[in-house]
């Protein structure tokens, strides 16, 4: 097994660590999958604990950051950094430890992009905060922000990089399919975080 394959496997396994679930148990909240949307990500954890939600967001982001860091240590290929990020996100979405039922990948995406292009993270957060302040839908804000960053990657990176990022974006949008259906039917819950 070559080093690229090792990094990809490690990226998936790191991404698979279910910090939202672990922190919820440590914090005495029990199984977060039985609360709200049933998701293990920061948004669902927020419904029970703001502090644990922040910790979940940061740790899920670190998963992406570490995966890209490993890619950059062992390869100078920029596209490989995107691939490692994608496998970390896949791990977060489909963790082997939880029968492949995980989160939606936004925090892990942001963490991975910190080392690829931090300015895109700033753009993502600006758009997310703006849309959330207006509509109060975390899912809508995440989807639109991800699409915008995909356009930035297309404008400033190679076609190979863009292809990988589009694949990541499609995975993220697919993970939000239930949210999209609820928004279209007017049944999506708004989230109040003080914005």
UniProtKB/Swiss-Prot annotation:
Any one of the GO CC terms: plasma membrane
E.C. code: 2.3.1.275
Main location, first listed in the record: membrane
Name the record gives this protein: Glycerol-3-phosphate acyltransferase
One annotated GO biological process: phospholipid biosynthetic process
Family: Belongs to the PlsY family.
Transmembrane regions listed in the UniProt entry: 3-23, 53-73, 80-100, 115-135, 147-167
Pfam families cross-referenced by the UniProt entry: G3P_acyltransf
Job of this protein: Catalyzes the transfer of an acyl group from acyl-phosphate (acyl-PO(4)) to glycerol-3-phosphate (G3P) to form lysophosphatidic acid (LPA). This enzyme utilizes acyl-phosphate as fatty acyl donor, but not acyl-CoA or acyl-ACP.
Pathway: Lipid metabolism; phospholipid metabolism
Coiled-coil residue windows: none
Keywords: Cell inner membrane, Cell membrane, Lipid biosynthesis, Lipid metabolism, Membrane, Phospholipid biosynthesis, Phospholipid metabolism, Transferase, Transmembrane, Transmembrane helix
Source superkingdom: Bacteria
Membrane topology (UniProt): Multi-pass membrane protein
Entry-linked InterPro entries: G3P_acylTferase_PlsY (IPR003811)
Gene Ontology MF annotations: acyl-phosphate glycerol-3-phosphate acyltransferase activity
Source organism (scientific name): Ehrlichia chaffeensis (strain ATCC CRL-10679 / Arkansas)
Record text on subunit structure and interactions: Probably interacts with PlsX.
Reactions it catalyzes: an acyl phosphate + sn-glycerol 3-phosphate = a 1-acyl-sn-glycero-3-phosphate + phosphate
